[in-house]
Amino acid sequence: SVDAGVTPLAATSSDVAVAVPEPMPGGDEQVEYTSVQKYNLRVFDAAGNEKLCIDLSSLTEDSDYFYVSAFAVDGQGNTVLMTGGNALTILDAQGNVTGSIDLSTEQTGVGNIIALADGSVAALVYSEDYSSFDLCPVDMTGMKLGESIASLPTDAYSAAPSGGGYDLCYNKGESFYGYTMATDTEEKLVTWINCDVNSSNVSSASITESGDIVCLSSEYSNTGEGATTYLITLKKTPYDQVPQKTTLTLACVYLNYDVKNMVLDFNRKSSDYRIEVRDYSEFNTDDDYTAGLTKLITEIGSGAVPDLLITDNLPMDTFGAKGLFEDLWPYIEADEEIGGRAGVVEPFFNAISQDGKLYEVTSGFAVRTIAGPASIIGTEPGWTYDDMFAALDQMPEGCELFGLGTTRNDVFTSICTMNLSKFVDWNTGECSFDSEEFISLMEFANRFPETFDWENHEWTPEDNDSTRIKEGRQLLVMLSLSDPYSYTYYSEMFNGEMALKGYPGVPGSGAVFYSNGTGLAISSTCANKDAAWSFVRTLLTRDYQENYGYGFVTNRELFDENIKNMVGQSYYTYDESTGEEKEIKFTQENADTIMELIENTTMVADYNSSQINDIINEEVAYYFSGEKSAQDVAATIQNRVSIYVNEQR
């Protein structure tokens, strides 16, 4: 047990070595202390007995900040230390320094050093385009890096020497791989979470000669009580010797920490069901970081739908129109613990529903809107693009509508995203891009500059939104509200006289929702829907949202409680132009404004219709360049998007 903390760890067939920063004693408050850092290299045998303790202080004498970023031990007991990321230091088996290698000549940089199965040590040197690693042996005689002997994927950054017939092993996404240099092939051995292991907690994973997988797992407590570290051994076991459970598949593109813990908890507690994760991020390549997402969307579109789905970045409007996923409203209504519709923030879930059907749930949300000074724009939500410029006419000469550097593409993209669900009805396949409203949006955006010369602009604190608004140089701000603090932050910009006016053409409050947490959905073809719901409902529980909720939570009881508890609380902010601290209190009036905003918001922003956005941006460029009229561009967009939408339904 080492309280000071262990940095890198390396091993030979008989010994284990660790680099440990040595803690300095505390003491009397009357005494002035100077910070001192000291590293020891400690070598232990298989029984845990210390064989060697080497003081590395001599290596720190010429460095203001010394640290060991990686090290490896070769078959003869020589240790290679990577210090500060720019040098390798070689020590013999007795701990004597025998030489060093300057890494600053490696222009692309060295990512790591690793011991190989043949007992040698090699450096992982980034390739010229950073798409792979060149595996370069460490020449301990010539004190240099040798020529590359293999090209490894960037996932091999944390590679370790391997037994079981593999040269190296490493993590890749949620899975663990063995790599064979002779054939330049990798083999997926396990998906950690499907073995009830949290990959986020795994370190020092390796493969034994018998093929077992051994790793350390540090599990952290939410109560701040520190971590407990376990030594885990995974053994190949015949399928018929494993307790049998019904499997539910969960597909995702990256598995975040919160849902990972949900899956582990579900699998440990359920005696009848087990969730198996398929993380499509493993199909991403260095050339295409969206390959996994594309593959998942294609498979779902062709009918290969998983039982459960993490909906982040996926076109749920398209999937919903095809009836691929279960309506979750009946499950919420029948769930007595959640409390039915009254137990969730219903306006948000109504907004993300399609034709009254709720295809996904999430733990948090936020609201986007446009705000300005109440004395100029009025307090009632709703206005037109012409109203915006009419309000601007009341401001001093030189005042701008939005923040410094706002271009027409900024304005068009932002407002179009907020309004996209108005122009596309996935349930009927009807589109309305040839409407006066969409044409007005293009014409409004075209009144802004094409570009802003940031390269030649020297930014100062006076350029921030807060200072510009207070000095009458900026009228409005597009903002996101995700908690009471964000409201008071923006309200202070307008000296407490902020009006939430909303986006032109957006009904109700003029604001739009967007999801601020992971979404989950259940396939309409899932054979065990009740079991799937017992997992999905976790997102909506008070316990989950107290621990993992972010922004405005969707559990109604907790949401109301959070708002109520913030009334009277003080926030402190700094005036960026003066540096003065200012206290701001969250009032009951502020709370009422937030509640009214949420209760009257009916639309949701669409960030996931990338194909539609590509069509729109391609065509609107012809209008912005003056090549086509707004009407002609709108007609083309209407035609192209209508065809696309109906092909996808």
Language model features by range: what are they?
Residues 276-343, 466-476, 492-493:
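Extracytoplasmic "Venus flytrap"/periplasmic binding protein-like
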Residues 314-369, 386-387, 497-504:
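Hinge/lid segment of periplasmic solute-binding proteins
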Residues 491-561:
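Extracytoplasmic/periplasmic substrate-recognition and gating elements
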Residues 428-462, 489, 498-503:
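Glycine-centered hinge/linker elements that transmit conformational signals in sensory
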Residues 29, 93, 106-118, 123-128, ...:
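Conserved N-terminal structural module of periplasmic/extracytoplasmic solute-binding proteins
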Residues 514, 573-645:
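C-terminal capping/gating helix-and-loop segments adjacent to ligand/active sites or protein-protein/ligand interfaces
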Residues 329-343, 421-443, 502-512, 626:
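Short, solvent-exposed loop/beta-turn-alpha elements that line the ligand-binding surface or hinge
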Residues 357-368, 387-446, 472-476:
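Extracytoplasmic/periplasmic solute-binding protein
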